Design a protein with these regions (language model features):
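Positively charged n-region of N-terminal signal peptides that target proteins for export
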Residues: 1-4
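Hydrophobic h-region of N-terminal signal peptides that target proteins for export
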Residues: 7-17
């Protein structure tokens, strides 16, 4: 019976849960152009549609989207991994079907438009946001701000 003990301990070691994975670092630092895209396209989008739940007053999921540094840091799950859109949890949630439980913005909020999603994807991918796409995303963000100001919130 004694010879089976090392085998049993080895099996337990492989079956034990592994330590949580460390959050991956961005592939490379942001360029000045990427920082500019963030400031003119992405941050206004977040300010209009995300910061009320992910900002200084409220940090759902321990995620803040009110600054570039906070956005890149992420929350419980990493928000963005620049250069690796498939590893970016927030991006995945933005592209979920509107009926999915984890969709962002939540179902009861105004969804991001396709142009906003495309701009966000380009940013996370590490690519410059093309001018026409940036203009369309900015226009959609302005519409979302107007809608948020004029649409009454349902009482909870």
């Amino acid at each position: 019976m004694r010879p089976l003990l090392p085998l049993f301990l080895a099996a337990c070691a492989f079956a034990a849960p592994t330590a949580p994975k460390k959050k991956p670092e961005p592939v490379k630092p942001l360029t000045p152009a990427q920082k500019s895209d963030y400031a003119k396209v992405v941050q206004p989008m977040f300010d209009a549609q995300c910061v009320s739940c992910h900002g200084p007053k409220k940090e759902k999921g321990k995620l803040r989207l009110d600054t570039l540094e906070a956005t890149l840091k992420g929350g419980k799950n990493l928000a963005f991994v620049i250069g690796r859109p498939n590893d970016s949890m927030l991006l995945a949630r933005v592209f979920l079907d509107r009926t999915a439980g984890d969709v962002m913005p939540p179902k009861e909020e105004h969804p991001l438009t396709e142009k906003q999603k495309e701009a966000l994807y380009a940013f996370v991918e590490g690519q410059p946001i093309p001018d026409e796409l940036a203009k369309a995303a900015i226009a959609d963000t302005r519409k979302a701000l107007t809608a948020a100001k004029t649409t009454p919130k349902p009482k909870k």
